[in-house]
Amino acid sequence: MAIILGIDPGSRVTGYGVIRQTGRHLEYLGSGAIRTSVEDLPTRLKRIYAGVTEIITQFQPDMFAIEQVFMAKNADSALKLGQARGTAIVAAVNHDLPVFEYAARLVKQTVVGIGSADKVQVQDMVTRILQLSAKPQADAADALAIAITHAHSIQHSLTVAKQSSQAVSSEKEQILALMKTRYSRGRFRFRN
């Protein structure tokens, strides 16, 4: 069982979503947005840090997943987004949370099945996957999608590890059986 906090960073609106993963089952715990007003950037970053810290304190997540920065046409916007993202990551690291990063395209591919999905499609699929009674707001839905992507990544890693372990175990058993057969027939000769 793991509680995952997903963050969709932004210098004006930072979405968050919290889910609990138990095996393949995902449970919605909460979501929303940290909104900053038209203050100067340092004050907005301070609010983002305080907001993420409050969410971490409230939900006690085990893992922190955040969207990677994409290359924006406007360099100033990209820098502000990077600073907001860094602020959220610092809040997570200060609470000893492991940080996982996912590209927006991968998040959309994982949740919707199409890497170029729009916000409405993401909201619809998040609502279905988490069996919510109402659609979450766009920024919260994106954050929940990031958390779902991380949960999927964990489940996929466990499945691959289990399959690898079974394959190694099976191969080991085959080698031991072959060695027993050859040994019982006297085919092994030991040299000094």
Swiss-Prot record:
Function recorded in the entry: The RuvA-RuvB-RuvC complex processes Holliday junction (HJ) DNA during genetic recombination and DNA repair. Endonuclease that resolves HJ intermediates. Cleaves cruciform DNA by making single-stranded nicks across the HJ at symmetrical positions within the homologous arms, yielding a 5'-phosphate and a 3'-hydroxyl group; requires a central core of homology in the junction. The consensus cleavage sequence is 5'-(A/T)TT(C/G)-3'. Cleavage occurs on the 3'-side of the TT dinucleotide at the point of strand exchange.
The protein's name: Crossover junction endodeoxyribonuclease RuvC
UniProt remark on cofactor binding: Binds 2 Mg(2+) ion per subunit.
A GO BP entry: DNA recombination
Location in the cell: Cytoplasm
Active site: 8, 67, 139
CDD domains: RuvC
Record: residues binding Mg(2+) 1: 8, 139
GO terms assigned for molecular function: crossover junction DNA endonuclease activity; DNA binding; magnesium ion binding
Residues bound to Mg(2+) 2: 67
Single GO cellular component term: cytoplasm
Catalytic activity: Endonucleolytic cleavage at a junction such as a reciprocal single-stranded crossover between two homologous DNA duplexes (Holliday junction)
Assembly, per entry: Homodimer which binds Holliday junction (HJ) DNA. The HJ becomes 2-fold symmetrical on binding to RuvC with unstacked arms; it has a different conformation from HJ DNA in complex with RuvA. In the full resolvosome a probable DNA-RuvA(4)-RuvB(12)-RuvC(2) complex forms which resolves the HJ.
Organism of origin: Glaesserella parasuis serovar 5 (strain SH0165) (Haemophilus parasuis)
Cofactor: Mg(2+)
Lineage per the UniProt record: Bacteria, Pseudomonadati, Pseudomonadota, Gammaproteobacteria, Pasteurellales
Protein family: Belongs to the RuvC family.
Cleavable signal peptide: none
E.C. designation(s): 3.1.21.10
Keywords assigned by UniProt, alphabetized: Cytoplasm, DNA damage, DNA recombination, DNA repair, DNA-binding, Endonuclease, Hydrolase, Magnesium, Metal-binding, Nuclease
